């Protein structure tokens, strides 16, 4: 009996905890191509993390280089200090990169249309998130509608699906799910402001959410902190 041919999909792979988890979720049912973005982020260690994660599961990658630092206004792409030990979720933080997920999904959509791929996975999360408006279900629904209205290849019977399997999960639930899927979280990088040798600061929003997630899940955090 021949093996069932899997559909193709695109996974936006940042190298972080969430994207590593959705990669393993997607691999259960799809042949995956990972899109990795070098967008001028200060935490470039996530790029090498993403490449390593993709290498481990032996999937093709497409590295896309864009310079969001040209626009600034974010602590991740501009000469702005990354906030530490602040209350998360009170307001949209300075680590928000303007229109980042719209840009990333647009690149993914272009790659999808050229390669006739109808499924895109992104690891946005609306519960344990830092107040980013482009991580909300409403944003994803709006983008998916736009994608199906504005592309040639979606005018037939098959439609584009933006998959967000983590959107209603807490960080602890994500970690528990990924652990069951054998995600190696030691390979992932979350920190917004790592040391020169890649150690995580332990105090930025991303580090706090990560540490709290592992603690709540009752799983040892494999991250190397300063």
List the predicted regions and their residue ranges.
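Residue-level signal for alpha-helical context at structural boundaries
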Residues: 157, 161, 196, 222-225
